[in-house]
Amino acid sequence: MAAETASGYIQHHLQNLTYGQLPDGSWGFAHSAAEAKAMGFWAFHLDTLGWSVALGLIFLLIFRMAAKKATSGQPGGLQNFVEVMVDFVNGSVKDSFHGRSPVIAPLALTIFVWVFLMNAVDLIPVDWIPQLAILISGDPHIPFRAVSTTDPN
């Protein structure tokens, strides 16, 4: 692991994989929280961006699979799950938005499912995905956070 002490362990888990413009004008990865802070506006949290895109693709894949296998007769488990989510969001939109707009319900469904999936990543133990990142990168000190909802950026 990246730290020998409990304090170091916690500090390591509070840092994102940050890529940005360093104070000398070059671009690179931040190796500490101070370097990440010095990058200012031009700092990109690659772990957050990567998980956001990956979860968005998972959302699209699941809903596409459900749409392709949808039947009007006897629905399967995935179709039931998607229908429950769509009905829940549709009911919430109808209760809170009384106008007519073709954009509101699909947008609400997208946001609901994306936040649901981002919070579902919390069910994975905190060290598993960073350990996978360490195995892939070969860098035992790589800061990597899998839970995108903890990033205020």
Curated annotation (Swiss-Prot):
It comes from the Bacteria. GO terms for biological process: proton motive force-driven plasma membrane ATP synthesis. Signal peptide: none annotated. Keywords: ATP synthesis, Cell inner membrane, Cell membrane, CF(0), Hydrogen ion transport, Ion transport, Membrane, Transmembrane, Transmembrane helix, Transport. GO terms for cellular component: plasma membrane; proton-transporting ATP synthase complex. F-type ATPases have 2 components, CF(1) - the catalytic core - and CF(0) - the membrane proton channel. CF(1) has five subunits: alpha(3), beta(3), gamma(1), delta(1), epsilon(1). CF(0) has three main subunits: a(1), b(2) and c(9-12). The alpha and beta chains form an alternating ring which encloses part of the gamma chain. CF(1) is attached to CF(0) by a central stalk formed by the gamma and epsilon chains, while a peripheral stalk is formed by the delta and b chains. Belongs to the ATPase A chain family. This is ATP synthase subunit a.
